[in-house]
Amino acid sequence: MGPKHFLNFEKISNQEFVSIIERGIELKNSNETEKTLKGKILGLVFEQPSTRTRVSFEVGINNLGGSSIFLSGSELQLSRGEPISDTAKVLSSMLDVIVLRTDNHEKLEIFSQNSSVPVINGLTNLFHPCQIMADLMTFREVTEGKNLEKVCWIGDGNNVCNSYIEAAKLLNFELSIFCPKGYEPNANILESSKKFVSLATNKEDALRLSLIHI
């Protein structure tokens, strides 16, 4: 059995999702952080720039007793034509977990298929699941554990929006998307969760919902 990756919400259960969020809140509120990742090394492979995602992963691994190595796109042999499959094999032979941030989701899939350690999606053109985990953890904190019922997304149908669509299906909440024509979310992702998602083109429908994420 190979490593368990976190590329999107397709292969994670509702129970796993909730337990991760609850564990995150528990660690956040703990005065003494458990050093459960002592001796582990996290590789941050970022072809795209980042502030919040990079810092949060670096702080997290350090708080849990591990360490991190950061590699930008210009520091990798990928820029010289090395296959991403080879990069994945080499890096995973020396690291314990890898966060990949790239502009192409297919790259992430190829990388994970050739990695011997878990791979986490730090952002692709198609999904940004870690952002949704952070958003919904915050919601759970401020509502003291209340289940999410309705979300309204206002803006272009980008990678974060696509991840919200997957989350709606996973957590069984209603997602209304207010998106200008020509900026709709990925059609295949939308179709897979159509029972939980509606796409609006007028602001009146969007404003009737209870939670707005811009």
Regions found by a protein language model. Name each.
Residues 212-214:
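Conserved small/polar residues in nucleotide/adenosyl-binding loops
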Residues 1-55:
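Positively charged, low-complexity intrinsically disordered leader regions
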Residues 31, 35-140:
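Phosphate/diphosphate ligand-binding glycine-rich loop within oxidoreductases
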Residues 5, 67, 118, 174, ...:
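Conserved beta-strand segments of alpha/beta enzyme cores
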Residues 23-29, 81, 194-201:
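Short gly/ser/thr-rich secondary-structure transition/capping motifs
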Residues 2, 37-38, 115, 147, ...:
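Residue-level preference for short coil/turn positions at secondary-structure junctions
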Residues 47-59, 144-197, 201-209:
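Glycine-rich phosphate/diphosphate-binding loop of Rossmann-like nucleotide-binding domains
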Residues 95, 209-210:
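An anion/phosphate-binding loop that grips the pyrophosphate of nucleotide cofactors and donors
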